């Protein structure tokens, strides 16, 4: 077996953060005893007869796969260019506020109001508000221009909005920001409490600002936040619709959302397909920056929304997901967030054609399943420089999502795989560190999803997987550094495999194990790029 502790090419890796340095140090220390043992050095594998002189494509057939040297130059990539975040600030939010003309607030019925149809239409949802308000349901409507919530003190009935102590307001009806209106909730409002018992929530169809404040789903009977108990129990929420803009800055949102359509927590969503065709609104806009979101059903959700910014937030102890952009949302920036303690599923997930987006410099840890997930044909995304650790499943997971680049991530001490790729092609993994994960450092595989509850027409898939792995370190992962089952192709170059957990040394599971000697000889001893692919494709190459 090759001694891969020797002759590893020197190269520049991303700077290790303290946790990454500690984990890597521990696994390297664990591997020192193995590295010190004398091992039999392999003989170089000779080129196959019949190759043209000067080519580096000698075939080495093993089972149904071949190991081939590949040109390294096409594998070179410059570090990815990240979006400039300097413009997404509290001052930039302030500059977006237009304070004239002044607007007004009034109490009106909820029925026959476009922004509320999602909550008063099918599935007998109107009954929820009848039960809670004990009357034909009403809401507070902001109309006609700019309104600061603090200025409404004493101007509406206490059954609608009451200031219960200086700067602390309780809303006992839903608040609707109408098209053409602006609602500003600023530091004059120490806390806006949305009454759970009375069915209050926030709907934005105009411009909504929450700055230096606190908004809480509130149990009036218990005099505390409406802490999560069961999925279907109503809790207040915030939704911003197509054509509207929402800017949440330096604020805290607690105990939002439940298991009902568009009532998930903090949501930015185009109108439903039927209403969208009728209303023809542009896609919604918004930023969520430098804020804290706690105990929400979904910490953040979007649907058919473009160019949103989710930056510098803390998502803590949310229920299903921390950050969940969904269906056909594009060019998102998800950066500098800390996401931890998600109780049911993933920290950060983008799902169903969330394309051309940037997920970088986030920390996602101690979530119930994976730290970061790309799902259901989400393509063209960059996942870079994230620290993903101690999650209860994988670190980073890609399901049925091709053409994505993972660069410089530190994926550490997760309970399953470090980086897992399923049914996804043209996945490029550059300069990543996967260390101390309980199963495989990088795991690629295929799975037939036909006989599952998946809607194949809505979420098609191919049972194909292909990866390019360049640079980085795979160290001290419990079941091995790398495994790819049935790859369409796999390219490896400058990958350091360190600190095996088994006394026998580095072991590549699965089909890679059958040709481990050839792979490690080319990759480590000869410092060449290695291509592993099916015999059929190599036969096509020769033809």
Curated annotation (Swiss-Prot):
Listed EC numbers: 5.1.3.37
Membership in a protein family: Belongs to the D-mannuronate C5-epimerase family.
Recorded GO MF terms: isomerase activity
Annotated phenotype, changing residue 385 to F: Can complement the alginate secretion defect of FRD1200 mutant and the epimerase defect of FRD462 mutant
Record's keyword annotation contains Isomerase: yes
GO BP term (any one): alginic acid biosynthetic process
Active site, UniProt feature: 326
Result of changing residue 361 to A: Can complement the alginate secretion defect and the epimerase defect of FRD1200 mutant, but cannot complement the epimerase defect of FRD462 mutant
Disulfide bonds: none
Name of the gene encoding the protein in the UniProt record: algG
Documented effect of changing residue 365 to F: Can complement the alginate secretion defect of FRD1200 mutant and the epimerase defect of FRD462 mutant
Coarse class of the protein's main subcellular location: periplasm
Reported impact of residue 383 to A: Cannot complement the alginate secretion defect of FRD1200 mutant or the epimerase defect of FRD462 mutant
Source organism of this protein record: Pseudomonas aeruginosa (strain ATCC 15692 / DSM 22644 / CIP 104116 / JCM 14847 / LMG 12228 / 1C / PRS 101 / PAO1)
Protein origin, superkingdom: Bacteria
Effect of residue 324 to A: Can complement the alginate secretion defect of FRD1200 mutant, but not the epimerization defect
Domain notes: The C-terminal region contains a right-handed beta-helix (RHbetaH) fold, which is common among proteins that bind and cleave long-chain linear polysaccharides.
Protein name as annotated: Mannuronan C5-epimerase
Outcome recorded upon mutating residue 367 to A: Cannot complement the alginate secretion defect of FRD1200 mutant or the epimerase defect of FRD462 mutant
Keywords, alphabetical: Alginate biosynthesis, Isomerase, Periplasm, Repeat, Signal
Enzyme type, top EC level: isomerase
One Pfam family per UniProt: NosD
NCBIfam families with a match to the protein in the record: epimerase_AlgG, para_beta_helix
Outcome, altering residue 272 to N: Loss of epimerase activity; still capable of protecting the polymer from depolymerization by AlgL lyase
Activity regulation description: Inhibited by the presence of acetyl groups on the substrate.
Keyword Endoplasmic reticulum attached: no
One CC-aspect GO term: periplasmic space
Signal peptide span: 1-35
